[in-house]
Structure formats: C-alpha cells, structure tokens
Amino acid sequence: GFPGFITARLVQALLEESPCRYREIVLLVEGRMKAIAERRLSELVSGDSPTVRLVVGDITEPDLGMAESDAKALRRAKIELWHLAAIYDLAVPSTLAYRINVDGTERVLDFAESCKHFGRLHYISTCYVAGLRSGRCFEDELDCGQAFKNHYESTKFWAEKCVQKRWESIPTTIYRPGIVVGDSVTGETIKGDGPYFIMNLLMKLPKWVPMVDIGASQATVNIVPVDFLVNAMVEIG
C-alpha cells in the first residue's frame, strides 16, 4: 500500500518505535509509483532507522509480482505481512474492484502460505463490510446476508471472506476502520475524497449562499483520524 496515506503513516509509526520490532521493512510498490515512493520514503527514513527498501510488485500477480530473488528471500525469512493495498474509489467498476481487492488479497494469502517462517498477516479491512446493515455490528459478524452500496464495499466484504477462510493456516489480525481522515492534531492529510470532497465543495460556494440542512442535520459520521488508527494498529499488532 505504500506510498498511500495510511501506509506511509504506519511505516512512520513503526520506525518511531524504540526499538523497532522489525530488522527490515520491505515495501511493495507499483512500478508506476516507484519515483513517488522513493521521495516519500526519503522523508521518513533517518540514519538510525532499520533497513527499509522498496520492492516493485503487483498484488494481483503470483508472488505479488516481485522479482524471483526478492520472493525467494522473503520466503526464507521470518516475516509478517501488512496488507493495506486496495482500491478505495466508491465509483470503481466491479471488475477492477474485484481484481484488486479480492484477487489481490488471494495472492497475498497465497504468498503468506508459501513462506516457511510466516508470523502474522495484518489485514486492513473496513467497517463497511457491514454494508446496509443497521444497529450494532460485532467483530465476529461478517456474512449476515447484507446488501452493499457500491463495489468497494462488496469487494472488501468478499476479500475479508477469503481471509477468514484461511486464518486457521495463516495467523491473522483484521482491522475494520471507518472513513480515515487527517491527523487529529494537525489536520494533515493527502486525501481529497470522502468528507473532504464535500467540505471543499461547500467552501467554494459564495459566502452569501445560505447553508441549508439536507437530511438529518444531527447525523453522526463514522470517521477516524489517521494517527488514532495507526497507533491502534501498532498497539494491537
């Protein structure tokens, strides 16, 4: 998922641990994102950080699209996998969403099972696997026959089904955050979608245009600051 919004903050949090739990951190990066990833990584890594390196790959391919030498080295090592790569566009076509979110997760699971000294899979799901259910949804409830608003929700649901089918052979922790927003203190974010899209739209309206409540003006929004999420993931993980 690097250099994505959540993954970059997760890497930063892991590097700030003292001591860092990992001797080496390997970041799988799409080829088209390599230059951006290199710049982002240079901002995060200091001289006393553990080894952090980028590996070009593709989660939809066997061995996650890595070079054979990289795949072999990781199979021999004692590793944990953090799987954050996904397509989040709520208007994404079904075929693309399925290929990235479901097929990609299956390839991650395949690779995990092929590792000789595999430790744990950390799978970042979403609270929206609950779909159109109402009321309280508990962590041990996944498939309740629910419907979904879009292909993002449905494919993340199917991806989590794939993860749960194999967690007897693959030790797994599943995280289901809500809508992830910027830092709770600074507000820093690189995102422009979700609630930010609506807020930016409202801010562009002329100041003399009256604000009108549409729908339930007192409704709650399921959001979580990225620093809270990442700190929780590091603590739980």
Language-model segments: what does each one mean?
Residues 135-136, 149, 165-221, 226-235:
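NAD(P)-dependent short-chain dehydrogenase/reductase
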Residues 102-108, 155-163, 198, 229:
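Conserved catalytic Lys-bearing alpha helix of Rossmann-like short-chain dehydrogenase/reductases
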Residues 80-84, 91-99, 103-154, 172-174, ...:
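Conserved Rossmann-fold NAD(P)-dependent oxidoreductase catalytic core, especially the SDR/UDP-sugar
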Residues 51, 111-118, 159-171:
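A structural motif corresponding to the C-terminal end of an alpha-helix
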Residues 12-16, 110-114, 165, 200:
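Short, well-ordered alpha-helices that flank and scaffold nucleotide-derived cofactor binding pockets
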Residues 30, 59, 126, 177-180:
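Active-site loop/turn elements of alpha/beta-hydrolase fold enzymes
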Residues 1-87, 94, 115, 120:
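N-terminal Rossmann/SDR dinucleotide-binding element
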Residues 2-3, 10, 101-107, 218-237:
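C-terminal, well-structured subdomains that either form a transmembrane helix-short loop-helix hairpin
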